[in-house]
Amino acid sequence: MNTFDLLIDHLFFECRYHPWTVRNALDFFVESYSYKDQCSISFTHDMGSHYVFTPKGQSSYEIPYLTDCFSYMTQEQLCNWILAAAVYAYRTGNTVWLRSRKETLVECFQSMQKRDGLIPDGIMDVDSSRCEGGSEITTYDSLDVSLGQARRNSYIAMKCFASYLALGSMFEQLPMEEYQEQADSAADNCEEHMLAYFDRKKKRFPALFDGEGTMAIVPVIEGIIYPVFFGKPEAVSEDGKHGRLIRALKEHIQTVLVPGICLFEDGGFKLSETSDNSWISKIFLCQYIIEKVLHMNMPQVMDKADAAHWSWWMEE
């Protein structure tokens, strides 16, 4: 129930039509479904299942000692709370609520920094102690390591970048100038190190920033949707402060959206070069980002992809 992975995907619709549901979920996560590990605060994957709430601070999904499906999503759920809070606060103008969550925002920022590890490059290095020797996963847990592993993952790194921008935006509204400067600096640091992993020869980002996971993924772009919806579209503009990163992402998409890499034979999106598992909601989100945030005009790719995705739905 109230799976955070779904809340973040439904966020844009909910904030437009009934934003109070987002606020209630954010509050309930803080009050009953947050927890602290060796780093600091994070949030559970869900609040229970089959109409039964789980005990406080526990989900129905996450289990220790694992390295893939059913492990913890500590870093990603932390990002999800930050991003959802930023979008809700901006879309509603509810600064009263934002002020009531000042302490939570500071805790979230400190938690983000500690998960960065001993070498602060803005990219997640620390698996939660709740994993008990296992390792964290992402919402893409049913794919292979290219998207399933959270640590040093380019998809998670971009989400962390967006989360630092979100924290900077909320600290600016409060105002909390010192924290705003620190969050903005953390976003800059994250961008700089992500760009260092961009392969100039292959013209793409690797899935994992670990020197080994060189396969390509499409959702590396997913994080840049959020600044558009929390009032900082210039942060993800090709002509803005982070223009180098945006241009690199455009080059990445141009490179990987070809058959044999991140397109199936029928032209449908293949979220990972090395996994045949895809799902349509994430594909639609990436298509929107390509067309409306990156402003890429790719009619031949998109028209064929739309036809393929339609055929997937219509298959019996």
Kindly give the residue locations of the regions a language model identified.
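Intrinsically disordered, low-complexity regions of eukaryotic proteins
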Residues: L7, S129, L143-S146
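Extended aliphatic helical segments
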Residues: V22, V30, I41, V52, ...
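Aromatic-rich carbohydrate-recognition surfaces in CAZymes
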Residues: M1-V126, G133-E136, R152-L167
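Well-ordered alpha-helical scaffold segments within catalytic/enzyme domains
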Residues: I8-W20, N80-W97, S111, K159-E177, ...
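Non-catalytic carbohydrate-binding regions of carbohydrate-active enzymes
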Residues: S111-D121, S128-Y140, L174-V218, P233-E316
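Short beta-alpha connecting loops at secondary-structure transitions
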Residues: L66, D141-A150
